[in-house]
A protein has these predicted regions:
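Gly/Trp-centered helix-boundary motif
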Residues: 1-196, 200, 330, 344-364, ...
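Alpha-helical transmembrane segments of integral membrane proteins
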Residues: 166-383
Length: 383
């Protein structure tokens, strides 16, 4: 290279076409959709790190000069002078032993999703700490053996905070909401992703080849779609042992149909276009024509439906949990909290908390879906 010649501009690792760049700009200019995506990603990232936010084990501990990581490793209690069992770091014996010979760093919330609150200030379900009276807090401190509990000026500040109270089983609601948000979001994203792949594949095969194959698959899909989905879901959920992947498989049996008609219509429209005929004339295989030439255009319609499929998947899981046919008993679930709220109308913090988180998550996904749909609409522009 000659002296003084400017170095060639480094190309980015990905290149957006002018049309996709316009779509991305339209999405960014849609403030409601863009901010909804940011908020959802932040909440989802926090839920993925739930063990570091809400846990009944310390993040880091030092005992007799040894650095321990209880959040990753299950240490036996005999390591701290106790019995041969899993260490309970909330046990006063274990906690005092570690504090006497080291230190502990706890997460912001010292409850996991299955941690049972010992010596609650009131009969379960316990209201949030900020709703308790000083007399209730003093009584709770006396149960825990805290000195000077009867004369403490601000006794509620000395209790472990229950920001949103507990449920009827003595579990911290904030911890249950964080872990329940993660399960719901992962369930919706996985179900939407897998069902979209199957639906796009089936629609592409139908639309591209057409003829008797399209006719036969269309009749099968019509029969399959006419089955009573809700009754089949209830029957299968009652017969099979409930689990995350069992529910995922059951719902996948019906959710893949939602994208077939959209993708099929796009392939039926595009299979006779000039660029497809030119690709056939050049000797390209059907698989290459479908994947490289027709599928990118058909995916535009599929992508606009994706956020709404995630929304529908989360709503279905929440409904099944509310009916008692979803996740196994004891699993953190937004639907199970809603059911507890219905059964405990005198404890409104349970139902209101679960409803607020569920409504927020579904609203964010709807706003994201509307923004994606408008971004792909060539007739809409945003200033």
């Amino acid at each position: 290279m000659r002296a003084g010649a400017s170095a060639p501009a480094r190309r980015p690792w990905f290149n957006l076409s002018p049309m996709n760049r316009r779509r991305l700009d339209n999405f960014r200019r849609n403030r409601r959709g863009a901010w909804s995506l940011r908020i959802f990603l932040v909440l989802f990232a926090c839920s993925l790190c739930a063990e570091f936010i809400a846990n009944d084990r310390p993040l880091i501990a030092s005992y007799q000069g040894e650095l321990l990581f209880p959040v990753f490793v299950d240490y036996p209690e005999d390591k701290f002078g106790g019995f041969q069992a899993r260490a309970d770091y909330r046990d006063p014996f274990v906690a005092n032993e570690i504090k006497a010979h080291g230190w502990m760093v706890w997460p912001p919330i010292r409850f996991a999703n299955s941690t049972t609150i010992l010596d609650p200030p009131t009969p379960l379900p316990t209201p949030p700490t900020w709703m308790l009276s000083d007399a209730q807090c003093r009584a709770a401190l006396q149960k825990q053996g805290v000195k000077d509990a009867a004369t403490a000026a601000s006794p509620c500040w000395k209790l472990e905070p229950l920001w949103l109270g507990s449920d009827q089983d003595g579990h911290d609601i904030v911890a249950r909401l964080i872990y329940g948000f993660r399960i719901s979001a992962l369930f919706g994203l996985i179900l939407a992703g897998v069902s979209s792949v199957i639906g796009v594949f089936a629609g592409a095969v139908q639309g591209y080849f057409g003829g008797w194959l399209d006719l036969m698959m269309q009749r099968v899909i019509e029969i399959w779609s006419s089955l009573p989905h809700l009754y089949i879901l209830i029957i299968l959920s009652a017969i099979l042992a409930p689990s995350f992947f069992v529910l995922l498989t059951i719902l996948l049996l019906f959710s893949w149909v939602s994208l077939v008609h959209v993708v099929r219509a796009e392939f039926l429209r595009a299979r006779n276009f000039e660029y497809v005929n030119a690709a056939r004339a050049l000797g390209l295989s059907n698989a290459k024509i479908i994947v490289k030439h027709v599928l990118p255009n058909a995916m535009v319609a599929a992508l606009t439906f994706l956020p709404f499929i995630v929304n529908s998947s989360i709503s279905t899981l929440t409904s099944l949990d509310f009916l008692g046919l979803g996740m196994p008993p004891g699993s953190p679930s937004l639907g199970e909290l809603l059911l507890q709220g219905k059964s405990n109308l005198s404890a409104p913090w349970i139902g209101l908390s679960a409803f607020a988180v569920t409504a927020l998550m579904l609203s964010l996904l709807i706003f994201i879906g509307e923004a994606v749909r408008d971004a792909f609409d060539p007739r809409k522009t945003f200033s």
